Structures are given as structure tokens and as C-alpha cells.
């Protein structure tokens, strides 16, 4: 994933990238047009206001009279009211665009993420996704709604001001306009460098988000391994880099802003000096000089702001690329158009066309290698699993026990060969059809924030409270509920962190019972669980295995002995298969594994029973 984080995005303007925003912007064309019109009105009013100042000096101050003041005041008030109304309308439109555009982009991204394959989440850090779904979409919607507004106002205002200055006195106007190219070059020079460091800050912010997420979710591990200092040092290193980049940008700004003020002051000085002589020579009216001074004071801020915003827009292009790259990410496992037409997809399932699943599975001459792997993990592997068979997969940690399960669940597909479900190649059926018939309980099951009842109901969203409680009783998960202060409505915490591993497994078993899958997959927990909970878990497993085709990544001797077929994995390859007694008689790798690991478990149990007595 480092390659993803370090990708260098296009730095020059690329219209093709911006066109990708078209589908998101199209619903808000009316709001954009309205924003454009009323923004133009605001800029026009800002251009006109110094002319009111000129009129007041000419007609009231120089003539020392208030004749005509009331119509003047009413006209001035009307212009201010028009400006205020325009600000309200374009601000509402900008807010409407920002909120809805951000909502649409986040919704579309989240919808797309639901379609991506299991393998994508295996290699993609959560921080990477959070940055794109939240930070990048917020930045895009905010800049299009507000920075774009600022650019429009600045362009309208600068053009209007130039026109007004030229109309008032073209010689004096040219003296001010001559400074503009110098300001433009200066702004371009500094903004490019400021933008470079701001980009670095954003890139580091993405890494910090990921590191922060890992630091919080892994806090227990950090504390138990006493690695707080190392974790904090690594986090501090990232924040220090971000701090240093931010300081560099701030230093450039500290030089740039005074230079802008200097040239702005120079423009005003030129107007006052040259204009003053022209007033003395009666070549220019004092009222006109007053208006000119107001224009000279105000014209350079919009120019500088426009340059800064344009630089930010080039930077924004990287955010658009990051979001669209994620949108372009394709599921590794995809149903064919014919399958989707018949069975539907994850968001539009055609359940009426789904055939009942019995649970007969056949691996037929399957060869498989992982997409990023060079060698085959399986070669010409064949196995017939009748309906209701329990298959235990054993092997040392890291041996590749999950490969067969990933293939059976269609998280990956065979490189060669076929996998048949009920006699039909599972690629001829939809993924949703298969996954809706699979109950998957992980070593450390994931529970969602919410109550125990809500977590069990994830197995069947329309289940009644009675069905939820019956499913829990079937696997003794009600014993967990009885210990909780608020019973079924107790909050399990984020990820279920208020429950022990054993309790989370029991809740997951209840969820699986409620879903009533025809295929059950269990990755047994390797962590130690108290004897009482372990017995409850074993009873729950026995209940779930009944009349279901089951795959068990097994660690307990009692589970393995009950299996109809044991598959033995070594270095990513299946080296033996058979029943427990048969494999022991062969005195092969399973026998060695049993002697080293499972005999120790038996001895530990005997010692435990003896001490208990």
C-alpha cells in the first residue's frame, strides 16, 4: 500500500480529470448558474461603490451642500440591499452545493466500496479509505462551492475595476495596471512553492490518519506488548514531518504576504503621487482621485486571492484523482452480465430466481495462485464434499489454511478448474446467492456498535425479537446476555470490545443460527478461553454443524476428531487428507503435527482435570 500512498498525481491542469465530476455536478447546474449570476451582481456592486464615493465628494463635499442627499442615500441603500440579498442567495446556493455534492460523492464511494472484493480489503489500509471517502470528498465539495465562488467574484471584480479605472482616467489606470504583471509573476512563484509543501502536508495527513486509526484500534496490543513508546515515536515522526512541511509553507507565506502588501502600497502611492500632481494641475478631479485610490487599494487582494485559489484548484485535481481512482477500482470477482440479469446484484437482488442451496461442494481439478503471487498454491486439486459434511483444515500458523475457504466462499476464484455447488459451477450463480447461504465466524468476530439484539439480528434483518432470542438460546448466547446490565439492549461497544473473545463468538454463532446458512465456516479462536465458555462454544459448534456443510479452520482436538474429512496444510499446499484415525496410522505430517500440538492440548486438559479434582 505504500505505492498507493506515494503515487504522484498529475500536477498540470487536465480537463479529462475534471470531467469525471460531471455526473456529480449535473444535478446542481441550476444552483451553479444562480451562484454565478448573484456573484456577478455582488462584484458589480463592489465596483460601483467607489463611484458613489466620487459622486458624494463632487456633489456634496465640494459644493458644500446637502441638496439631493435623500435620493443619493436611498440609491446607496438600494444598492447595499441588492448586494446583501445577492450574498444571501449565492451563499445559500454554495452551501446547497457543498452539502449535497459531498453527500452524493460519499454515498457513491461507500456504495462502490460495498461491491469490491474481499482481496481489496486485505491490502488496503483503513486510513487510506477514510482519507478518500471523508477528507478528499469534503475538500472537493468545499472548494467547488466556495473557492470557485471566490474566483468568480475576483474575476468579475478585477475586470469591472479595470474598466472603471480606464473610463475615469486611462493614463492613471495604466500606471496601476503596470504593476499587475509583477504581482502575477510574484504570486505564481510563491504559490507554486507554497502549494508543493501544502501537498506534502496533505499526503502526510493521510498517513497520519492511517497511523492514528491503527494506534487506537491496536491500543490493547500496544499496551500488552509495552510498545507505547515506540508507537508514540513513530506517530511523532509523522507529525514532525507534517509540522516541518507546514512550517516551510508558513515561512513562504510570511515572505509572500508582506511583498503583496508592499506592491499594493506602491500602487496606492503611485495613484496618490501622480494623481495629486494631476489634481494640482487641474487635469484630474479630487473626487476621481478618491475613487482611484479606493480601486488601487482593493484591486490587488482579488488578484492574489485568484492566484492562490487557482493553485489550490490544481492541487484539488489530486483529490479528484484519488477519489476517481477509488471509483475505478474494479471487483476482482465479478458476476457475468447474464448472471446479474437472472439473479440481480448486491443492491438489487432477484431473490425469486434463487435456487435453494443444499450444500454439496466439489473442487474439480482446481489450480490456484493468488493475484499477486508467482507460484501455484493449489495444483490440480480435487475434492468432493457431500451435503452435510464437516471438513477440518489443520496446519501450522501461516501454512495457508484459509486458501480453501476463500475459494469455497468465492472470495477468490480458481485460476484453472471448477468449483461446483450442488453440481453447478458457482460462477453461473451470483455471489450474493452464495454468500447469503454462508455463515462465517472468524477467530475474533466483528460486532457492530449497538446492542446485543441488533448484532444478532444482522443475520436476518427482518427477524422478530422472539426469533433473535431463540437463536441465542440455541447456542447458549443467552448466557452472555444474562451477565449484562441491560440484557438484550446492552451496548457491545465498538467492534464488540466490551465483550470477551468467547462471548463475541457466541453472539456470532447466534447470528449464524438466525441466518440459517447451508454452509458454515468457522475459524476457531486460538486465544485461551475459560473452560465454561469453551464448553458453551463447543456445544454451539456442534449445533451449527448439524445438517450443514462445514469448513473448520480447526485448533481444538475435539473439533478435529468430529470432522468427516481432515485436510492437512503444509507450506501452502494440501499434503494429506482423511479421517483422524486414518491419518494417525499413516504416521505422516499430520501425525507429527498431532504429536507436537494436539497431544500437548490433551495433556493440558488432563492436568487441568486433575487439579480441578
Predicted regions and their residues:
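Juxtamembrane loop-to-helix connectors within ABC transporter transmembrane domains
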Residues: 17, 25, 90, 94-98, ...
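ABC-type nucleotide-binding domain
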Residues: 343-613
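Hydrophobic alpha-helical transmembrane segments of ABC transporter permease domains
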Residues: 37, 45-49, 86, 98, ...
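Helix-loop-helix
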Residues: 62-71, 164-178, 248-321, 326-327
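An intracellular "coupling" helix at the cytosolic face of ABC transporter transmembrane type-1 domains
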Residues: 22, 27-30, 118-119, 135-144, ...
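Transmembrane helix-loop-helix hairpins at lipid-water interfaces of multipass membrane proteins
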Residues: 32-89, 166-171, 282-286
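Conserved catalytic Walker-motif region of ABC-type ATPase nucleotide-binding domains
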Residues: 113, 235, 323, 363-365
